[in-house]
UniProtKB/Swiss-Prot annotation:
The lineage of its organism: Eukaryota, Metazoa, Chordata, Craniata, Vertebrata. The chain crosses the membrane at residues 12-31, 65-87, 100-122, 127-149, 250-272, 287-309, 426-445, 460-482. It is a multi-pass membrane protein. This is Protein-cysteine N-palmitoyltransferase HHAT-like protein. Keywords: Endoplasmic reticulum, Membrane, Transmembrane, Transmembrane helix. It comes from Mus musculus.
Length: 503
């Protein structure tokens, strides 16, 4: 019943045909809806003039995307280009000092952007966690880290500390929350690693060099301290062919930015959900496509942002966390995350520490609850985040409960009688149901509870059985294609390992 079970080529071809046709049909419905709603009064704030020579308006509902790649694009490019230039000069002249150069440039960038008082505020938090690390008590470091994080997420702490920022500008809140929150996680990682390795005697300078690395400072991704320290301490030697991969990644990120810009001139996927009266008139296929595309866009946004940052980090001879796994390939709650760096941090210091190998029910429940408590604090406590955390925590545990149930009793006997191909089909069907649970649970936080209720009601209640079964079958086809991709990768990895053994 393993991952290497193959299906007939004709069957996979049918799945590809069905999935392609369904996506094209849903896309056409969204395109028509976007054209019909372009001049609605409710769309005026978030659908602005775009390609006037083609008569196309543009969806600008995502404040962060507009800020990053329109208003503040030149500032971001200038700051990162300066970092790359000085890093290259330092690597050529004094490679042993490059980590200091990273820190000095990062500190200057933070002071120039947010002001000296904001820098002093962050240094205060760094000092608190550094002193805690000297005591060698893991629980104390984690408790102080969470308390420090809470001070940036709830009042009165957040109101008081936001006053340390000098000046006002459009991206100020985003930079404040990003820089502060990531600083706390990095300092907590430093403290926990110091407790885990008391023989290594990390210094305050190591913490500052780690925290003020500019490409990761405001938006992440976060690297745990042990990985960053090990990589930045190595001699900067670039493997053969790596520069080509860096250029390819940079080109891919640029192409994705252009593709999103083009997409938003034709599909108003972020604006339509805000007008429930208009969204409720969409055909079922277009509504399902709208829900799916909202999650895909969030993944693309994360992949582009981390792709740009990771390109700079790779030029600095670092191996940063990879972009998140595409939502299209997710049919298991255990693999669902939109920030691989945060996911790695949570797994290392909370989830795996409590849950062990995640094979027993009670430790897994305790580990997942603790993980989502920290995640709730990271995202900022509010009703929507509470609901999102409860739903995803339930989904993660429900998978284990179903797995345990399937391993014993009648279900295990039934599966044992099935062929490997039929077992794969049954599991793909379960994966299709899980896929839509993942979409619904995350749509709550990415969009709104009201829009999620509309989608659920249309796809499950009023659309039953035709729409429900049609969407489920299309999703089943997609899951089978994802499984086939996973099978191919597993075979390639096995062949690579066999070649290494022969060599």
């Amino acid at each position: 019943m393993g991952i290497k079970t193959a299906l007939p080529a004709a069957e996979l071809g049918l799945y590809s045909l069905v999935l392609s046709g369904a996506l094209a049909y849903a896309g056409r419905g969204l395109l028509e809806a976007s054209q019909d709603g372009a001049h609605r009064k409710a769309f005026r704030e978030s659908v602005r003039p775009g390609w006037e020579y083609l008569g196309r308006k543009m969806d600008v509902a995502d404040f962060e995307w507009v800020m990053w790649f329109t208003n503040f694009r030149n500032v971001i490019v200038f700051a990162l280009s300066g970092h790359v230039l000085f890093a290259k000069l330092c690597t050529m002249v004094a490679p042993q000092l490059r980590s200091w150069m990273y820190a000095v440039y990062g500190v200057l960038a933070v002071v120039g952007t947010m002001g000296p008082w904001y820098l002093l505020l962050l240094l205060g938090h760094c000092m608190v966690l550094y002193v805690a690390s000297l005591l060698g008590q893991r629980w104390l470091c984690l408790a102080l880290g969470l308390a420090s994080l809470a001070s940036f997420k709830v009042d009165p702490g957040i109101s008081w500390q936001s006053g340390f920022v000098t000046g006002t500008f459009d991206l100020q809140d985003v930079l404040f929350h990003g820089g502060s929150s990531f600083t706390v996680l990095r300092c907590t990682s430093f403290a926990l690693e110091s407790c885990a390795h008391p023989d290594r005697r990390y210094s305050l300078a190591d913490l500052l060099k780690y925290n003020f690395y500019l490409p990761f400072f405001f938006f992440g991704p976060i690297m745990t301290f042990d990985r960053f320290h090990a990589q930045v301490s190595q001699e900067p030697v670039r493997p053969e062919g790596e520069l080509w991969h860096i250029q390819a990644q940079a080109g891919l990120s640029a192409a994705a930015i252009v593709a999103v810009d083009v997409f938003f001139h034709f599909f108003y996927i972020l604006t339509i959900p805000s007008d429930l009266k208009f969204a409720s008139r969409l055909p079922d296929s277009a509504l399902a496509g709208l829900a799916y595309s909202n999650l895909v866009y969030d993944w693309v946004k994360a992949a582009v942002l981390f792709g740009v940052v990771n390109t700079v980090a790779r030029l600095d001879h670092l191996d940063p966390p990879q972009p998140p796994k595409c939502i299209t390939a997710l049919y298991v709650f255990g693999e669902t995350h939109f920030d691989r760096g945060i996911n790695d941090w949570l797994c290392k210091y909370v989830y795996d520490h409590i849950g062990g190998d995640h094979s027993t029910v009670i430790p897994e429940l305790a580990a997942s609850v603790a993980t989502f408590v920290v995640t709730t604090l990271w995202l900022g406590p509010c009703d929507i985040v509470y609901l999102w955390s409860v739903l995803n925590c339930f989904g993660l545990n429900f998978e284990l409960w179903v797995q345990k149930l399937a391993e014993r009793g009648p279900l295990a006997q039934i599966e044992a009688r099935l062929s490997e191909q039929m077992s794969r089909r049954v599991r793909a069907l379960c994966g299709a149901v899980n896929f839509w649970a993942i979409i619904m649970y995350n749509l709550v936080s990415l969009n709104s509870l009201e829009f999620t209720e509309l989608v659920a009601r249309r796809l499950i209640l009023t659309g039953f059985p035709q729409t429900t079964l049609a969407v489920l079958f299309v999703t089943y086809c997609g899951v089978q294609l994802v499984k086939e991709r996973e099978r191919s990768l597993a075979l390639e990895e096995e062949q690579r390992q066999d070649r290494e053994k022969l060599e």
